[in-house]
Amino acid sequence: MEIIIHRGATQIGGSVTEYRHNGWRLFVDFGEQLPGTPVYVQLDMEGLTKGDLSKSAMLITHYHGDHIGNIHQIPMEIPVFMGKLGIEIQKITSNHLKEVDRKQACLLERLNKAIPFEAGTAFEFGPFEIMPIVLDHSDRKSVV
């Protein structure tokens, strides 16, 4: 297995981590960089925003913008997994903001196709077995 930290190793916010195994890719989080970040980098990544997407998936750990803020850039054919409660909370937020922020409407559209999971219940994607574990991170049911 290969683990690649595309962004987030030297900064807070905007994290994107990729796990690769036998041609499969599991990306974890695709967030916005925090305001005041010295260099804004829009990520255009093989297997996530371009190229062969057939063996790729995205897992969102929780609904903070620095973890979920760019999922509207992910093509619809890539499955997005996210905790059920987090999906519902972000849908409410995006629904309220969509009239003043077009990006929120795009986030909402992408969330409508998200695949919910429950903490403590394992699920699989390709060769990856994922066991969401609850952790406290200033939102209810953040997972790692």
Describe the role of every protein-language-model region.
Residues 3, 19, 29, 62-63, ...:
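Divalent metal-coordination and catalytic microenvironments
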Residues 9-13, 135-140:
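A short catalytic or substrate-binding loop motif that flags glycine-/basic-rich loops and adjacent residues
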Residues 11-14, 18-60, 73, 82-85, ...:
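Pre-active-site segment of Zn-dependent metallo-hydrolases
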Residues 58-68, 134-139:
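Histidine-centered catalytic micro-motifs
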Residues 143-144:
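Conserved small/polar residues in nucleotide/adenosyl-binding loops
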